[in-house]
Amino acid sequence: MTAAGPGIRKAAAVVLTVGLSAALAACGSEDGGGGDGGDHAGHKGAPKLSVSGAYVSQPPMDDMAAGYLAVRNAGGGADELTSVTTPLASEVTLHTTKGNRMKQVSSLDVPADGRLELTSGGDHLMLTNLTHRPKVGERVSFTLHFATSDPIEIKVPVEPTTYRPKD
């Protein structure tokens, strides 16, 4: 029986190695091109962001305007809006609003499977040092920058000061 022992051990080692290789291959990462971004085997998915409802309110002053939009995250991982750039303003800052108090912040959370809502009277973008006073109907380029996702470029319409989007 000792003569067969090393052969059996060798065969068992080969079977174990092949089995482990197959198991590890099955647990590999999903490819970066077009995966569904869902939760795979208990791992958080990547954020999947889209933007809707964006607009700039026509400013009553020449040097400052406000921007509003919604960022939808259909992915299983959270992200953060870290900055916004536009040729319309030399500076865009992110603001939260609690009660009557407005506070500048360095980022805004985009929750997994959730939305970030920037609305009039709520969290919003402040555009300062405008290059010109935008007029109703004009379209302004914005680039949204995130902590983990690629930047998103959008064209944003300028709406009347009294504009309120429909829900």
Please report, for each region that a protein language model flagged, where it lies by residue.
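Compact, glycine-rich, soluble single-domain proteins
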Residues: 28-31, 36-148, 152-167
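Bacterial N-terminal signal peptides that target proteins for export
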Residues: 1-15
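Hydrophobic helical h-region of N-terminal Sec-dependent signal peptides
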Residues: 16-20
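C-terminal motif of bacterial Sec signal peptides marking the signal peptidase cleavage site
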Residues: 22-26
